[in-house]
Amino acid sequence: MCQSSWVTRQSRRACARDARVVCTTVGPYTKYGSPLVAACVETGTDYCDLTGEVNWTREMIDRFHEAAVDSGARIVHSCGFDSVPADLGTLLVQSFAAETFDAPCETVRIYLDGGSGSVSGGTLASFGELFEAAATDPLARETLRNPYSLAPSGERSGVDPGAQRWPRKDSLRGGWTAPSPMAPVNERVVRRSNALLGYPWGREFRCTEVVPTGE
C-alpha cells in the first residue's frame, strides 16, 4: 500500500514505481483517471480499473498503447462487472468450443440474468461525463456509435452491428430479450480481446449481450 499526493506528476510516478499493480476504483475516469494511467505507463507498472466510460478507454488506447507495449505495463480497463464476466466468459466458451468441436463459435450471446446490485455515486457521475462528452465531442460520439471503437487502430470495422436497442424475440432461447445496460461496454471489450489475440474467433465473429424478459 502506498500513499501519495495526487497533485504532482512526481508523486504519482513514485507511487506507481513502488507498486507491482495499481487498482483504481475512483471515477469518473474521464476526470480522474488519465494521470494515473500515464504514471503506470511511464514506470512499466501494471494497471486495472472499473471504468465503463468507452470514450475515455478509447482515448487511453490511442494515447498510451504503444508506450505501454514499450514499457511493459499491462493496462487493463473495465475489470469489474463490466467487463470481466463477459470477456472471460467468452474466452472460456470459445476455448471449450475449439477443444470440443475444433472450431470457435461464430456467435456468442451473453444473457444477463438473475443479478442485482446498486449504482454508486461514482458510476452516476461517470454517466454524466459520458453524456456530456457525447454532446460536445465529435470523437466521443464516433466512439459510441462504432461497435469496434475499442479495437486497435486500423481494426475498427466489422460485421457486428452493435448492441441490441429494442426488445426482441430471441432466436436461440425462444423468449423475449431486452437491451442490456452493460452491452455497449462489454461487447466492445470482447471485440477488442478478439483483435488483440489475433482473431482466433475469426473476423466474422459476433458478440451480443441481452437481458431475458420471459416468454
Label each region the model flagged.
Residues 70-72, 95-215:
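C-terminal catalytic/substrate-binding lobe primarily of soluble NAD(P)-dependent oxidoreductases
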Residues 3-21, 25-32:
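Conserved Rossmann-fold cofactor-binding substructure of NAD(P)-dependent oxidoreductases
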Residues 28-29, 80-81, 153:
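Short glycine-rich anion-binding loops that position phosphate/pyrophosphate groups of nucleotides
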Residues 46-47, 75:
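Hydrophobic beta-strand scaffold residues
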Residues 86-96:
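Active-site-proximal alpha-helical scaffold in enzymes
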Residues 33, 38, 51-73:
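Rossmann-fold NAD(P)-binding glycine/threonine-rich loop
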Residues 54-56, 80-87, 115-116:
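Gly/Ser/Thr-rich loops at beta-strand to alpha-helix junctions
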